[in-house]
């Protein structure tokens, strides 16, 4: 089915392009551009930003997931649900850590009325259903090992997209490396317009190994 995409930018000019689905469309700060895309077959279609936009431009990849209508409706129904409070003690400790360290930029639906409410709305991805995705960190890292298996169309190793949280092989090592030192994995962009020692991107929070284990245990519950 045809899908209309609203394309915006928060910072500089980007260009949205999924070659198999349509032509390019610029993302310009302060404007909304529309682009109609349509996939003829279910699958995962790769794209790339085609406008030089900064230090990580070459790594600004995109993936569009096309599903059958019934699978899409099931995905939407799940995405509209709030995150559930974890029962596992380690995951519960991870939620407490998330509330103290991560909600400045990230949000999780159902965890937005806590004492440490998000201070920068929309500054970073909403993580309510993190584990239903195939990538993170702007599409740079694969959440599951199957994400690069198979042919160039990304068949996810034969696993249906909606089944990744239950059947996929979670790449825990890469997520731990990301939480341990994000700027070492993906350089931060300078942002001299804000009164902060940090640039744009995820800073190093200097988490201990125990804290990383707790945070990963919590993030794994976000399905």
Predicted ranges, named:
Residues 1, 12, 31, 58-60, ...:
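Residues that flank catalytic or metal-binding motifs in active/ligand-binding sites
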Residues 6, 15, 46, 50-59, ...:
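Periplasmic/extracellular electron-transfer cofactor-ligation site
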Residues 20-41, 73-84:
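Extracytoplasmic beta-sandwich strand-turn segments characteristic of Greek-key/jelly-roll folds
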Residues 63-69:
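Short beta-strand edge segments in extracellular beta-sheet folds
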Residues 71-80, 173-185, 194-223:
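C-terminal capping alpha-helices of c-type cytochrome domains
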């Amino acid at each position: 089915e045809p899908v209309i995409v609203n394309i915006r930018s928060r910072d500089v000019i980007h260009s949205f392009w999924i070659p198999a689905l349509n032509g390019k469309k610029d993302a310009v700060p302060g404007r909304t551009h529309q682009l109609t895309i349509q996939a003829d077959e279910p699958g995962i279609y790769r794209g790339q930003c085609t406008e030089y936009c900064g230090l990580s431009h070459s790594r600004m990849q995109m993936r569009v997931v096309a599903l059958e209508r019934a699978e899409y409706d099931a995905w939407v129904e799940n995405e509209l649900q709030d995150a559930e409070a974890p029962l596992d003690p380690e995951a519960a400790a991870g939620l407490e850590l998330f509330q103290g360290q991560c909600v400045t930029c990230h949000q999780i639906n159902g965890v937005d009325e806590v004492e440490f409410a998000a201070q920068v709305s929309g500054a970073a991805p909403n993580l309510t259903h993190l584990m239903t995705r195939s990538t993170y960190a702007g599409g740079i890292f694969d959440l599951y090992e199957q994400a690069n298996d198979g042919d160039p169309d990304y068949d996810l190793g034969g696993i249906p997209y909606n089944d990744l949280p239950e059947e996929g092989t979670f790449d825990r090592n890469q997520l731990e490396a990301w939480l341990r030192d994000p700027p070492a994995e993906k350089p931060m962009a300078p942002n001299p317009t804000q009164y902060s020692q940090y640039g744009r991107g995820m800073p190093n929070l200097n988490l201990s190994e125990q804290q990383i284990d707790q945070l990963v245990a919590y993030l794994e519950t976000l399905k």
